[in-house]
Amino acid sequence: MIYVDNRQNKVEASEKLIERLTEVIEFALKEEEVNMKCEISLLFVDNNEIKEINNETRGINRETDVLSFPMLEYEDKKVFKDMYKDYKFSQSDFDGDELVLGDIVLSLEKALEQSKEFNHSYEREASYLVVHSVLHLLGYDHMEDDDKIIMRSREEDILNKLNIIRG
């Protein structure tokens, strides 16, 4: 289940956008071989709120586009399908019958700004940021160059399969 909470009023969070981002999340989970019911919270905020959250949680006092808060722990260079595909989780990892994967905090204001900067649609930018964040929830990272190459490849593969293209 994808729980959406819109806590901003600077950029419209239309039903169409919410449906598309929900579809993107569900497809990314399927592509990453997550074979169980999952819970992800998707929180829409503005630039001021994401700056506050970024400062509180990461000690970085500036706005960003998206933040990811995974609930599962991953070994270095391991992702969900490597560690948890056939794992027997404890009941504390679940909310009811759904595995809690974590939270995505997305600045719709920043997504709109970046869509203009990169000259593609708002839907494409928001979708990219959500895929990026889902991959973080599943253990992907981009701090090292080799990890970044893998993560970017997965992002583009998922978006291309959904026909969400640049431009």
From Swiss-Prot:
Zn(2+) binds at residues 132, 136, 142. Coiled coil: none annotated. It is found in: Cytoplasm. Its EC number is 3.1.-.-. GO terms for molecular function: metalloendopeptidase activity; RNA endonuclease activity; zinc ion binding. Its cofactor is Zn(2+). Binds 1 zinc ion. GO terms for cellular component: cytoplasm. It is an enzyme of class 3 (hydrolase). GO terms for biological process: rRNA processing. Keywords: Cytoplasm, Endonuclease, Hydrolase, Metal-binding, Nuclease, Ribosome biogenesis, rRNA processing, Zinc. Belongs to the endoribonuclease YbeY family. Single strand-specific metallo-endoribonuclease involved in late-stage 70S ribosome quality control and in maturation of the 3' terminus of the 16S rRNA. This is Endoribonuclease YbeY. It comes from Clostridium beijerinckii (strain ATCC 51743 / NCIMB 8052).
